[in-house]
């Protein structure tokens, strides 16, 4: 669920009313949308909205599977989390947050856990106006801290490494891929992030073909990138068909490969419906 939509639910007359937020009912409503059979639970909710995600809530969400026959994926916390931090207390606290979330979400039996292996600090460093070589050196050093965090997460939770799907975010993905290979992790491919050139300059097809051996989940959304007088202007998490995504050709590629992994729309409800209608019109065999 998008943050703005969540805020609209709980803010009344300028003040938050957390009693208005019920994740079980939100999931139930989402499953009424045609073609939606996988729900991704954002574990940041547990920290943003007190009492919204508890062991009891997780049990109720798990029971919904008997009613609707759907499955879950889990997006592990990323706000205020930095697994690549060189500040050890911050790094260890980030690991603890991830581990707690995995344990809390276990009753859902998620298909995978989506992980940001680097956070906002690493993203900021990746944007530094230094030489590409210097930025790569610093990012590689931060990836070393991230790798240590991943190892600790796997050790403490004892989950299979391929259950961890590392998302392409604002950080050089060729560096992230080295962590994925080292620990035999999986990949969550966010199309909008790539279209906005957050994780690299490859085309959608080049990224997919290079990494499809590891891709187990899609965050399917549109995005744009423009260079305006030397300034990068980007947008992501757009409804399908409103950005630069080659909808027909990319979806056909997925159909040819018989991709069966979870496909998640990180969009508002109306944008999800708009996106599904676009896919239904352009490439109905993908639904």
Enumerate the language-model features and the residues they cover.
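Histidine-acidic metal/acid-base catalytic patches
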Residues: 2-3, 29-30, 83, 111, ...
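A structural motif
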Residues: 35-36, 105, 110, 161, ...
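Alpha-helix-loop-beta-strand connector modules within alpha/beta enzyme cores
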Residues: 58-79, 145-157, 245-253
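N-terminal pre-domain/capping segments
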Residues: 1-81, 88-100, 186, 286-287
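A cross-domain feature marking catalytic cores of carbohydrate-active enzymes
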Residues: 5-9, 14, 41-45, 74-78, ...
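Conserved, mostly hydrophobic/aromatic
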Residues: 39, 75, 94, 105, ...
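Active-site acidic/histidine proton-transfer and metal-coordination neighborhood
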Residues: 25, 84-186
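Acidic-and-aromatic substrate-binding clefts and catalytic sites of carbohydrate-active enzymes
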Residues: 10-23, 44-57, 82-84, 121, ...
């Amino acid at each position: 669920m998008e943050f703005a939509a969540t805020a609209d639910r709980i803010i009344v007359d300028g003040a938050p009313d957390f009693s208005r937020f019920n994740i079980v009912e939100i999931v139930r409503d989402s499953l009424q949308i045609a073609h939606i059979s996988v729900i991704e639970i954002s574990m940041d909710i547990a920290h943003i909205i007190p009492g919204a995600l508890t062991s009891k809530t997780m049990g109720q969400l798990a029971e919904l599977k008997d009613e609707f026959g759907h499955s879950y994926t889990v997006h592990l916390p990323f706000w205020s989390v930095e697994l690549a931090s060189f500040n050890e207390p911050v790094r260890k606290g980030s690991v603890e947050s991830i581990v707690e979330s995995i344990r809390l979400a276990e009753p859902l039996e998620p298909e995978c856990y989506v992980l940001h292996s680097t956070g906002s600090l690493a993203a900021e460093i990746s944007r530094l106006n230094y030489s590409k070589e210097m930025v790569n050196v610093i990012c590689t050093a931060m990836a070393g801290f991230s790798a240590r965090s991943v190892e600790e997460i796997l050790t403490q939770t004892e989950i299979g490494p391929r259950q961890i799907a590392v998302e392409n975010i604002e950080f050089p993905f060729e560096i992230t891929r080295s962590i994925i290979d080292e620990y035999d992790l999986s990949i969550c491919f966010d199309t909008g992030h790539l279209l906005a050139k957050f994780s690299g300059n490859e085309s959608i097809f080049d990224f997919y073909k290079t990494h499809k051996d590891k891709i187990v989940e899609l965050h399917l959304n549109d995005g744009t990138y423009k260079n305006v007088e030397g300034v990068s202007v980007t947008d992501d998490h757009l409804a399908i068909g409103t950005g630069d995504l080659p909808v027909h050709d990319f979806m056909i590629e997925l159909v040819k490969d018989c991709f069966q992994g979870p496909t998640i729309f990180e969009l508002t409800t109306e944008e999800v419906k708009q996106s599904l209608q676009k896919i239904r019109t352009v490439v109905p065999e993908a639904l």
